[in-house]
């Protein structure tokens, strides 16, 4: 699991085109968020059968990070471009859904962009010492 986290004052995306592994329906087709921790998340082959432990560690890190930066808004953004060893799309979709539920159970407001769609996106990264983080699980 590879994750690029950016603390953004503004983040937006809009679905443009589906890929062969696109989830249907693409919902929501677009989103705009303020003061959000945007998590570009890549599910890899090595993550298979480790989902529960990854979710536990991911949730703990996000709770810590959002507390440190004063943000409770999280955007999960599926992002295959962080790895050449992708896990199956079916498992990745399920993982992201489970992760969203686990984060919401901790009281965070969580949004997830559609899996398997090309998206245009724009962001303004806050630029403080914790605004950009990379994690591997």
Cite the ranges covered by each PLM segment.
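Divalent-metal-activated hydrolytic enzyme cores
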Residues: 96-137
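Alpha-helical scaffolding segments of alpha/beta enzyme cores, especially the outer helices
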Residues: 60, 64, 91-101
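Active-site-proximal loop/turn and secondary-structure-junction residues that shape catalytic pockets
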Residues: 10, 80-82, 114-119
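Domain-level signal for soluble alpha/beta catalytic cores
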Residues: 3-6, 39-49, 110, 127-129
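Short glycine-rich, basic-tinged beta-strand/loop micro-motifs
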Residues: 70-86
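Conserved mixed alpha/beta catalytic, RNA-binding, or beta-rich assembly cores of soluble enzyme
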Residues: 9-68
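Short glycine/threonine-rich loop-to-helix capping motif typified by GTGT followed
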Residues: 84-93, 124-128
């Amino acid at each position: 699991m590879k994750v690029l986290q950016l603390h953004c004052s503004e983040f937006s995306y809009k679905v443009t085109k589906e890929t062969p592994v696109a989830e249907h329906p693409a919902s929501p087709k677009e989103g705009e968020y303020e003061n959000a921790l945007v998590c570009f998340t890549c599910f890899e082959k090595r993550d298979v059968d480790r989902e529960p432990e990854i979710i536990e560690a991911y949730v703990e890190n996000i709770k810590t990070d959002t507390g440190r930066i004063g943000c409770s808004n999280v955007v999960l953004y599926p992002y295959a471009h962080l790895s050449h060893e992708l896990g199956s799309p079916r498992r990745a979709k399920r993982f992201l859904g489970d992760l969203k539920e686990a984060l919401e159970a901790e009281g965070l407001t969580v949004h997830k962009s559609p899996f398997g769609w090309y998206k245009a996106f724009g962001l303004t990264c806050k630029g403080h010492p914790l605004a950009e983080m990379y994690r591997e699980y």
